[in-house]
Amino acid sequence: MKWIKFFIIIIFSSLLFSCATTRSEMRMRPVEQESIIDGGKEIVKQENDGVKVVASYDGRFEQYAVFDVEVFNNTDLPLTVSPKDFTFLPMDKNRQNLRSRDGQNILGYQGIEPTEKINYIQHEMGRQDAKIKRARIVNTVLIVGGIFALIASAGRHSEGAWRTAQVAETVVQVAQVKRIIDHTNYYSRMDALNRAGQVWSQENFRTTTLAPHTSMRGGVFLETNSRAKFAELKYLYSLEKEPFGFMFEQWFQNR
């Protein structure tokens, strides 16, 4: 019983620590380009050969920076648009590209296709269902086995029977605690997946072909790097054209 009390104390202390931890919010603002403020957002735009991009930082979701982006196809030809046409390049305070820890590669992150995220979430939810089913089987076997051992040792007064009863009782207690942990983790994970699934399913900035003189607006999600002081959002709509580039300053602010 002592180790169970110790386990509960650890969990309670962890919860208190997590509640007391100061949270910080990642902030970004455009630099180097003229911007306008609309609805509290700093908006920047560029146009080249009939293609116009309007962008603003819209917050953070999980490990991603979210940009509210609208792409206008003001040409007379169809234009294929994809979140993967966007890249995010983290930079240091001198606006030099950050590199991997070994210094070999320049860091850069590609935009996320919502459909791929939705497929991943569905796969992960299925994996979690299978995992909890396996855990239930293991827990049931442990509890039933422990109870049978307790019954078998009941009424016997030998030292061996006493030890068997002690082990069986411990096994049952372990299985009960494990069952609680398994179900807590399962529901927590499934809740997070459901919330993420709702976010991704509502995003309409997906790979599509824009007809001439139409536009598409939505959230573009790109992974961030906490070491960055600046970051450049690039949009490459044609291999024959220079990409659009928007420079943002990045910092963290305590909430």
Q: Each PLM stretch: what is its role?
A:
Residues S226-R255:
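Terminal connector regions
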Residues A211-V220:
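Short Pro-Gly-centered flexible turn/kink motifs
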Residues L77-D85, S188, F230-K234:
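Short, hydrophobic/aromatic beta-strand segments
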Residues F61-D68:
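Short, solvent-exposed loop/turn segments enriched in Ser/Thr/Gly
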Residues V69-P78:
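Asparagine-centered strand-capping/turn motif at beta-strand->loop junctions
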Residues S13-I36, V54:
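Bacterial Sec signal peptide processing site at the extreme N-terminus
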Residues M1-C19:
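Sec-dependent bacterial lipoprotein signal peptides
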Residues S100-S201, T214:
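Hydrophobic alpha-helical membrane segments
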